[in-house]
Amino acid sequence: MDASAVRKRAAELPAEPGVYQFEAGESVLYVGKAVDLRERVRSYVAPRSDRIRRMVEAAAAVDFAVTDTETQALLLEANLIKRHQPRYNVRLKDDKSYPLVQLTAHEAPRIEITRTPDEAATVFGPYTDKSRVETVVKALRETYELRGCSDHKYEGRDRPCLDYELGLCSAPCTGEIDTDAYAEDVESARRFFDGETGVLAEPLRREMETAAASQAFERAASLRDRLEAVETFHEGGSEAVSGRGGRRLDVLGVAVEGESATVARLRSEDGKLVERDRHRVDAPADAESVPSVLAAFIPQFYAERSLPDVLLLSERYDDEELDQWLHAEGVDIRVPGAGRAATLVELALKNARRTTAEADGPTALARRLGIDRPERIEGFDVSHAGGKDAVGSNVVFVDGSPETADYRRRSLDDENDDYANMRRLVRWRATRAVEGRDDRPTPDLLLIDGGDGQLGAAQDALAETGWDVPAIALAKADELVVTSDGVADWDDGPALRLLQRVRDEAHRFAVQYHQQVRDAVSTPLDSVPGVGPELRERLLKRFGTVDGVRSASREELERVDGVGEDTAAAIDAAL
């Protein structure tokens, strides 16, 4: 992406907290958090370091997800970095994890703060403020006398330890409290971490008032500080992006606009919000359409996917057969009104609404061209060097966003004729579609990278094959839109920006493939001592192109199998 592309994308983002991702095709290059997404992404117009400059140049798109608070953004950022391992997230990718609280899977569960929870434990968090977590856990132990000792120390005791004398443990190890009573205390701790602040705040408040009445002012002040930590523990914390582990949870939020709708899905695995996706669907004509959208979306989406354990919805659908199916599959359906679950649903709704707003590009484009809303647009571009190593790209955008799984590319005849190459590329796509050899849906619009000549070549190919799909072109130099009716200079707006994104992505994808084809024949790596054909292939696979290898640090080179210090130094010197 160049400075202009970054500036345009930043203008499309909300001025809200959230997480952003720089992406190149299916690869996530960088994940970052922001108090203000728009301003943060705008700062990448002029990167401060060479490393970030290279990242921006390699990126093709910027995706985002809004959150309610900066803390939620911080934790979602950490989860996404751990999941995607982006190349340019050096500091955070290797950073330590955030503290968790676990109740162990023991007959008398232990409560403790940890960064590496036991597999079978009940886990809460992560949390960003460790000191506050320590205060809360200490308060829980004093109030409910939950044990904190290791299982090794617990086993075989014949008398209580010092924690019992200090009022920090009820000594289940020696039977000072029976199993049922201890289980009730553990359940109180669970309820607190599930959002019921009162189960801990009320006992602390009573104790504070008693201390103040007895003029034990230091004790009362200490309890006041502890009470404040407890009462603010769930404010803007991590529970929106992480919760009790062990189950898969999907959250669906729906935003309806006219006759179409966006369904945003958030996925939580093992208690952490790790992924989100968005889908456009046709909405029923009735005004109360959210339940109808859900009733249509759920069976279609999950027909070929594994169902979650819990499904959180923004509204309840009215479909008895769907209810019976989900119940038979063991799915717990909830429409939460408060707490962590409600916060997750609100996040899904926010992302659905943002996607609906972002999808205005296809609607604006339909108005400008006088066609039906082009939900699916395919972009085409050709890249070569003086007619050598000619390649073509075919990218796909659905509702204004890249559909990278549907990207295609192919080598073309080595001919220094842009029009002939474009004709071959579009004919290849059209022929496969007409003959039923391309399983991708028929697009609503084709966008050709170029001017009147390239568009004419593409239209010739469409006429030859009988593939009835409208096509337009976008010229690079003056950003002129070329149609069958002539050339137009559109004002900057959602329609033009969408065409620019498709055109730029087709160009990027073509250039990237051209470099790979060129590098597959002969590269500067061939003359580097210690780099044979297999190692060259691994390097190109890891870094994409020779330019990618050239921009890599020695440390990054040494992470490739077969590259030691000497070889990394030789590569660095040669390139």
Swiss-Prot record:
Places the protein is found: Cytoplasm
Domain GIY-YIG: 15-90
InterPro entries hit by this protein: GIY-YIG_endonuc, GIY-YIG_endonuc_sf, GIY-YIG_UvrC_Cho, Hlx-hairpin-Hlx_DNA-bd_motif, RuvA_2-like, UVR_dom, UVR_dom_sf, UvrABC_protein_C
Keywords: Cytoplasm, DNA damage, DNA excision, DNA repair, Excision nuclease, SOS response
Cited Pfam families: GIY-YIG, HHH_5, UVR, UvrC_RNaseH, UvrC_RNaseH_dom
Keyword DNA repair: yes
Domain UVR: 198-233
GO molecular function: DNA binding; excinuclease ABC activity
GO-annotated cellular components: cytoplasm; excinuclease repair complex
Gene Ontology BP terms: nucleotide-excision repair; SOS response
NCBIfam families for this protein: PRK14668.1, uvrC
Subunit structure: Interacts with UvrB in an incision complex.
Family: Belongs to the UvrC family.
General function of this protein: The UvrABC repair system catalyzes the recognition and processing of DNA lesions. UvrC both incises the 5' and 3' sides of the lesion. The N-terminal half is responsible for the 3' incision and the C-terminal half is responsible for the 5' incision.
Protein name, UniProt field: UvrABC system protein C
